[in-house]
Regions:
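Glycine-rich beta-strand-to-loop/alpha-helix junction loops that act as flexible
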Residues: 47-52
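Structured mid-to-C-terminal alpha-helical surface segments
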Residues: 1-45, 56-63, 68, 72-263
Length: 263
């Protein structure tokens, strides 16, 4: 889809070890500019999740992230937004699937990598259509991409860093992915953060999904049950930027002390 020379050019902006990752990374960057350059999309959706953390707050990216997670800002019909997303992402071709339900809409584009070995790539866009709220307020964040294949800029609608990390803390409890632990660890060790705000946001988002939010003791028990699980610990290492040193045990001790024991 993207000529080899543009992928080679983009390598100067990334440290990913294989060409397919470099190509997919460039696709993500263009998709973000295309989406948030559109007035309807920018009014309707906010950028959240791991890709938001690493693309707009924690540059250079410490780990690879391949999905775009969005949240519908207000409760309104989503179909006009889906139609506009399709229009803005025409450059990805026609191999597109859409799954809709009351809480989420998932769009997946599929394409083949340009540089051999040819592999199947995808861009998944997931829209949360249930959490029409924020805790610390939305913000506009300047974002730009420069490449001979595509150059452009926009203002991405997203959240305060502490709010993104509050939702990440919720994800750490809810699923078995070591990348959630890594993201929290990397943010705390590389940014001056308001821990109380992170915990406050976590509680607000957890209160939204469960009647009885887990206590600190319950969260710690949850983590003890998976911190040595190969599924959890093995999730992150293939995603790390070359040269990034990381140990799950060290990360857990830091997150346990700074966050979990303060819930």
């Amino acid at each position: 889809m993207i000529s080899r020379r543009y992928i080679e050019e983009w390598k100067a902006n990334t440290s990913w070890p294989n060409d397919a990752q470099v190509e997919q990374d460039l696709v993500i960057e263009r998709a973000l500019v295309e989406l948030f350059s559109d007035n309807l999309i920018r009014k309707s959706l906010a950028f959240r999740g791991g890709t938001a953390l690493h693309k707009i707050f924690m540059k250079p990216q410490a780990r690879y992230s391949e999905d775009i997670d969005l949240v519908q800002i207000t409760a309104e019909p989503i179909n006009p937004v889906l139609k506009q997303i399709r229009e803005k992402l025409k450059f990805l071709g026609t191999k597109r699937s859409v799954k809709q339900n009351g809480n989420n809409n998932t769009i997946v584009y599929r394409f083949e990598s340009e540089i051999p070995p040819i592999i199947n790539l995808r861009l998944k866009i997931e829209i949360n259509c249930r959490e029409h709220f924020n805790v610390l307020g939305l913000k506009e964040i300047p974002f730009a991409v420069e490449n001979s294949w595509f150059s452009g800029s926009c203002n991405i609608i997203s959240y305060e860093l502490e709010e993104l990390l509050g939702t990440k803390l919720r994800a750490l409890y809810q699923r078995r992915k070591g990348r959630d632990l890594f993201d929290l660890y990397w943010a705390i060790t590389n940014h001056n953060l308001d821990i109380e705000k992170i915990i406050h946001c976590y509680k607000e988002y957890m209160n939204f999904v469960v009647k009885q939010p887990p206590t600190s003791k319950m969260f710690l028990a949850n983590m003890e049950g998976k911190i040595y699980d190969p599924e959890f610990t093995g999730d992150i290492y293939s995603l790390l930027r070359p040269g990034v040193k990381y140990e799950n045990d060290i990360a857990y001790d830091l997150i346990k002390t700074n966050l979990l024991e303060k819930i």
